[in-house]
Amino acid sequence: MGKTKLKPVEDVNSEVVDEVEKAEEVEEQRNDREQEEEQKEEEAPKSFEELGLDSRLIRALTKKGIEKPTLIQQSAIPYILEGKDVVARAKTGSGKTLAYLLPLLQKLFSADSVSKKKLAPSAFILVPSRELCQQVYTEVSSLIELCRVQLKAVQLTSSMSASDMRNALAGLPEILVSTPACIPKCFAAGVLEPTAVSESLSILVLDEADLLLSYGYEDNLRSVTSIIPRRCQCLLMSATTSSDVEKLKKLILHNPIVLTLTEDNDKEEAVPSNVQQFWISCSAQDKLLHILALLKLEVVQKKILIFINTIDMGFRLKLFLEKFGIKSAILNGELPQNSRLHILEQFNAGLFDYLIATDDNSQTKKQKEEAKGEANKENKKNNKRSKPKLDAEFGVVRGIDFKKVHTVINFDMPQSVTGYIHRIGRTGRAYSSGSSVSLISPDEMEGFEDIKSFLASDKNKDIDIITPFPLLTENAVESLRYRAEDVAKSVTKIAVRESRAQDLRNEIINSEKLKAHFEANPRDLDLLRHDKPLSKTAPAPHLKDIPEYLVDAKTQEASKMVKLARAAMGNTRRSGGGGGRNNKNKKRSRKGSDPLKTFNPNGSKRGAVGQKDGKDSSSTKKQKTV
């Protein structure tokens, strides 16, 4: 018999070790796959049902056309439903409002909270501006109506009288939407009792928390927080992280859940990646020239929101653009609140393409002191004429949901990074594409560099996030210089002052005095237009069109590309609503089809239009059929 050959002990041990290592590798790979699958399941987008929302809220969202929750909603809603304090930071347009409204309403749906009769609202929602107050109130009222539940929400502003506030709160609403300045006024007037608020308040929401302190609401917030019970759930919503948010967090919250969320591929970007950011270097005197080139040569996409820092500059810009046939509307804190809301509604509805918004909070202290000094001098010269008081609660960059704004232009630069982020956040909302163009003068360059360095990521510090605007050549700008400078000289301080007064007189018609009339006759309100010319003299006809010899070839090609992109998006409507050849034909057809002329007693649908030499329609018909 043959002897079996035995392997050395060392060979056997090495084979065993190899097999064990292979088995361990297989086990590790399997564990890695399981972990990846679990992670994918956790990261997979959840539905509103999976978040534990009430079926009535889900039906309401379906009616509003909202099918899936955003990332901030997926993360925040479960924690809020559990009753935890939450600090949530997410970019503008990411759905923060619904992230707190949905769980807030669900908690108020419960039988316990509805059955108990309370002497004060159960939920306070505090926002920085009246415009945002109106927006949040409209959203929560819409959800309540669609859910068909017995809940009531009211909005209060500091301009309301004590009797108006008392009437608004007479129905014992569950939700109060207000600015921080209004709450202490309610306490002082006896409209709200601090003890009743302390007993009833269960949820406090601070929306746009990064702006509440920076715009002077600290004392108001301290008076509110002093009566907040410890059991009250507090929510802070913010677009940026700042020392003010940290200050509020320490002041109000107890062991909060901190959510800092960005969308896929967004990393820590403060401005959404779907917003392209550009800049143009020019002198302060040449800003009018450059904005004329941008708008008149059509190298930026409509609708356009233009930010300026002073009211006078806004009117100067409007008058300047009017001379070239460019209609625009103005939004500032000097206008009555109803007018401001109506301007926003018309702009969102697409009745005009250019809105000039005053962000006077972007002024530096020095600029504000200088403006105040000039105003005092003016008042001393003419005591009879006093300037209208500005609304301290006006804010156009603070969370306002502008619809389908494709381009934001910073005619004047904001004085802070936060201000820049909030301005740019007015475009690119709900994941749509957008762009921004900033006009930078030498005096603004230092602040601009601070903004650029803040936005630059740690990994890509050498890459400029804000790039030079490529579609406007120097030749294209210079070709318009003579016209622009000539027109700019005609827009004097006197013309600006007169147009400012005229605009205010025009907008008074939307004030509280006529509010009841417009509520009963809403069609009358639709007839009001906010982009009407303010200049007393009609613009020169030759300024409306640019001769071909002045247009730069490269810029003309860029303009064609922008128009093609606009057509692809279905945004081909001209500002002012319609117009053009088709509308003219419609007018002619209406004028030509007089029913008295076209009526035929024989029953023919075609009347006697076009009859000649006494021939009737039947003979004409016979001639045609032969």
Curated annotation (Swiss-Prot):
Residues in the signal sequence: none
Which reaction is this enzyme known to catalyze?
ATP + H2O = ADP + phosphate + H(+)
Q: Which family does it belong to?
A: Belongs to the DEAD box helicase family. DDX56/DBP9 subfamily.
Q: What is the lineage of its organism?
A: Eukaryota, Viridiplantae, Streptophyta, Embryophyta, Tracheophyta
Name assigned to this protein: DEAD-box ATP-dependent RNA helicase 16
Family annotation (PANTHER family) = ATP-DEPENDENT RNA HELICASE RHLE-RELATED, DEAD-BOX HELICASE 56
- Coiled-coil residue spans: 9-47, 356-385
From start to end residue, where is composition biased (Acidic residues)?
12-27
Q: Which gene encodes it?
A: RH16
Any single GO molecular-function term of the entry would be:
RNA helicase activity
**Which organism is this protein's natural source?**
Arabidopsis thaliana (Mouse-ear cress)
Q: Which keywords does UniProt give here?
A: ATP-binding, Coiled coil, Helicase, Hydrolase, Nucleotide-binding, RNA-binding
Q: What class of enzyme is it?
A: hydrolase
Q: Residue numbers of motif DEAD box?
A: 207-210
